[in-house]
Amino acid sequence: MRRRRKKGADEKLLSYTKYVLRDDIDKLKGKWNLKFRNDNPIHVEFGTGKGKFITTLAKQNPDINYIAMELKEEVLLKAVEKADASNLNNILFLWGDVSNILDYFEAKELSRIYINFCDPWPKNRWSKRRLTHSGFLEMYNRVLEDDGEIHFKTDNEKLFEFSLNEIAANNWLLKNISLDLGNSEYENNVTTEYEDKFMSQGMRIFRCEAKKRN
């Protein structure tokens, strides 16, 4: 089924010139500190959705720079509107595809990657599209600094099992694994819109962190 586009979303999104980047993103490769005008650590969320998670983090941590990447313009617009309403100065939004990150980021340019409730691509023939597939993990390994981390959350148990296996097989250090985040002792959880909905329905949320090995 073809996704229905919201009329005027493209134009409105691009009107937020303070926040939104779509064209010539590759020219910022290795120069994101200049774009942010500081040398603070850079954290990126792939598939930011409506933006509750990343904008909350940006409010809580003004000494960290955040980049939110999203391909769907309608939901990205909602995320940008949240940032604009709060007048955030430590966040940028990339209107682009995760598969192009090596064009966007220099080696060791990022400190942390967030992946929240990504498409599970359930059929085996689609496994390479999963954002925790080894092909993506290799790219993350390149753009993350030494000791950089991936923080991953999903409601899909099969995707979580797949992800743990892929992460371990690619020589990352797994830590802080939770099989039921809502009933765990983890105190610093910032939720997404999806997560709030799932938790209200009593669904389990799976979470882990993966640390890059030197």
Swiss-Prot record:
<dbReference type="InterPro" id="IPR003358">
    <property type="entry name" value="tRNA_(Gua-N-7)_MeTrfase_Trmb"/>
</dbReference>
<feature type="binding site">
    <location>
        <position position="119"/>
    </location>
    <ligand>
        <name>S-adenosyl-L-methionine</name>
    </ligand>
</feature>
<dbReference type="InterPro" id="IPR055361">
    <property type="entry name" value="tRNA_methyltr_TrmB_bact"/>
</dbReference>
<feature type="binding site">
    <location>
        <begin position="192"/>
        <end position="195"/>
    </location>
    <ligand>
        <name>substrate</name>
    </ligand>
</feature>
<keyword id="KW-0489">Methyltransferase</keyword>
<feature type="binding site">
    <location>
        <position position="155"/>
    </location>
    <ligand>
        <name>substrate</name>
    </ligand>
</feature>
<feature type="active site">
    <location>
        <position position="119"/>
    </location>
</feature>
<comment type="function">
    <text>Catalyzes the formation of N(7)-methylguanine at position 46 (m7G46) in tRNA.</text>
</comment>
<feature type="binding site">
    <location>
        <position position="97"/>
    </location>
    <ligand>
        <name>S-adenosyl-L-methionine</name>
    </ligand>
</feature>
<dbReference type="InterPro" id="IPR029063">
    <property type="entry name" value="SAM-dependent_MTases_sf"/>
</dbReference>
<comment type="pathway">
    <text>tRNA modification; N(7)-methylguanine-tRNA biosynthesis.</text>
</comment>
<keyword id="KW-0808">Transferase</keyword>
<feature type="binding site">
    <location>
        <position position="70"/>
    </location>
    <ligand>
        <name>S-adenosyl-L-methionine</name>
    </ligand>
</feature>
<keyword id="KW-0819">tRNA processing</keyword>
<comment type="similarity">
    <text>Belongs to the class I-like SAM-binding methyltransferase superfamily. TrmB family.</text>
</comment>
<protein>
    <recommendedName>
        <fullName>tRNA (guanine-N(7)-)-methyltransferase</fullName>
        <ecNumber>2.1.1.33</ecNumber>
    </recommendedName>
</protein>
<dbReference type="GO" id="GO:0043527">
    <property type="term" value="C:tRNA methyltransferase complex"/>
</dbReference>
<feature type="binding site">
    <location>
        <position position="45"/>
    </location>
    <ligand>
        <name>S-adenosyl-L-methionine</name>
    </ligand>
</feature>
<feature type="binding site">
    <location>
        <position position="123"/>
    </location>
    <ligand>
        <name>substrate</name>
    </ligand>
</feature>
<dbReference type="Pfam" id="PF02390">
    <property type="entry name" value="Methyltransf_4"/>
</dbReference>
<dbReference type="GO" id="GO:0008176">
    <property type="term" value="F:tRNA (guanine(46)-N7)-methyltransferase activity"/>
</dbReference>
<keyword id="KW-0949">S-adenosyl-L-methionine</keyword>
